[in-house]
Amino acid sequence: MVKGEKGPKGKKITLKVARNCIKITFDGKKRLDLSKMGITTFPKCILRLSDMDELDLSRNLIRKIPDSISKFQNLRWLDLHSNYIDKLPESIGQMTSLLYLNVSNNRLTSNGLPVELKQLKNIRAVNLGLNHLDSVPTTLGALKELHEVGLHDNLLNNIPVSISKLPKLKKLNIKRNPFPKPGESEIFIDSIRRLENLYVVEEKDLCAACLRKCQNARDNLNRIKNMATTTPRKTIFPNLISPNSMAKDSWEDWRIRLTSS
């Protein structure tokens, strides 16, 4: 794309437009939501709104994030997923208030991830899935507050041991990578402490396909349980339900509800 050229349906973002896109989150934080607006270049005018707590530029046509993004010193939540970004700026390491970073579904390579990422000492969730990473950045091993890491759908053939030693890691997604040994990903995951928090959704909130998937999984669990014992047992996990597309912030965790009857 020629420098300065706009996308086919690009929208000019003015300061007035940006201000109209500010929302207040349920916990009183200020979010600037510029997602799905056909933006082709990072709008410089939003730097005048650098007091935002959250910034959503996802599902646009952005190719480059400028160093000036570090002016968002209060930012705790940055969503850049589904763009055309192939490199993150070194200045991202200065955004030490960040708790959540989503850069999935871009064109990032391992060389496009700066070592300055290791300065994000407070970050808890990073999603690097659906990119072109052929190795895991060693900087991730320095982020001791990480609870969730997404590395799915990349070009990885191994995972460094430092990732499994992250003290607070609860969820790691490394599915659909070309690991050379069958089952390597499962063995790696087994070395990590299991997820402690499970979330509940009601059956009425599930789409038909998700509900069928859950019911099939529940039936399979019951069959395995029945094969392991000769004594008739009460059905286990009567309300096992699977990932819900509506709960996007859960990173596709399984939800399980245990009820007594």
Curated annotation (Swiss-Prot):
Any one of the GO BP annotations: intracellular signal transduction
The organism's place on the tree of life at top rank: Eukaryota
Keyword Aminoacyl-tRNA synthetase: no
Keywords carried by this UniProt record: Cytoplasm, Leucine-rich repeat, Repeat
GO cellular-component term (any): cytoplasm
SUPFAM superfamilies: L domain-like
Subcellular location: Cytoplasm
Coiled coil: none
InterPro entries reported in the protein's UniProt record: Leu-rich_rpt, Leu-rich_rpt_typical-subtyp, LRR_dom_sf, LRR_domain-containing, LRR_R13L4/SHOC2-like
Keyword Transmembrane helix found: no
Repeat (LRR) residue spans along the chain: 28-49, 51-72, 74-95, 97-118, 122-144, 145-167, 168-189
Biological function: May be involved in the regulation of spermatogenesis and sperm maturation.
Stated name of the protein: Leucine-rich repeat-containing protein 18
Protein's organism: Homo sapiens (Human)
